[in-house]
């Protein structure tokens, strides 16, 4: 829930506190992916859970496609919790009734040069994994993934 006063919010906090406590016993972390909630809501949830093994898998396209944040600005809010990054491109929703669209990397609205620069500024040195969910046929998918990888390598 985006409202921390929602009756379900305390249940989510309790469940995550339990899960992360159990994972910590085994030296494991729990990562939540960005997307359906604004970055400040995810940060508040992490802070309310209060365990030091709860982090974020940052997906810039999800933040755009759900209309929740500019991905570069979102790093100002969540940067210290980012432990994994999806390289995925997308656009903001065009109506209030549907999600934005996914695009091949470098063809959508994610400002990848600015995004990579901001990742470096916050000291992020973890993985950047290409995520590609567009069904375009095997050969076209392969080509767009290869082109996206080359584009990312040119700005890393």
What positions do the PLM features span?
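Amphipathic, non-transmembrane alpha-helical secondary structure
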Residues: 10-17, 21, 40-47, 72-79, ...
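C-terminal helical cap(s) of enzyme catalytic domains, especially alpha/beta-barrels
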Residues: 139-156
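Active-site acidic/histidine proton-transfer and metal-coordination neighborhood
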Residues: 1-55
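Hydrophobic faces of well-ordered beta-strands that scaffold small-molecule active sites
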Residues: 30-32, 54-58, 83-85, 126-130
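A structural motif corresponding to the C-terminal end of an alpha-helix
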Residues: 18-30, 115-125, 155-156
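Conserved residues at the C-terminal ends of beta-strands
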Residues: 1, 88, 131
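Short strand-turn motif at the edge of the Rossmann-like AdoMet-binding core
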Residues: 34-35, 61, 132-133
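Gly/Pro-rich active-site loop or hairpin
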Residues: 62-125, 134-143
């Amino acid at each position: 829930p985006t409202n921390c006063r929602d009756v379900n919010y305390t249940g989510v906090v309790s469940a995550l506190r339990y899960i992360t406590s159990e994972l910590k016993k085994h030296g494991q972390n729990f990562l939540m992916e960005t997307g359906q909630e604004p970055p400040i809501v995810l940060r508040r949830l992490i802070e309310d859970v209060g365990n030091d093994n709860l982090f974020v898998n940052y997906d810039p396209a999800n933040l755009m496609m759900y209309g929740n944040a500019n991905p570069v600005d979102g790093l100002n809010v969540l940067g210290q919790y980012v432990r994994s990054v999806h390289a995925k491109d997308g656009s903001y929703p065009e109506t209030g009734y549907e999600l934005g669209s996914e695009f091949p990397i470098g063809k959508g609205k994610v400002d990848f040069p600015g995004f990579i620069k901001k990742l470096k500024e916050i000291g992020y040195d973890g993985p950047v994994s290409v995520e590609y969910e567009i069904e375009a046929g095997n050969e076209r998918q392969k080509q767009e993934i290869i082109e996206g990888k080359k584009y990312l390598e040119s700005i890393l």
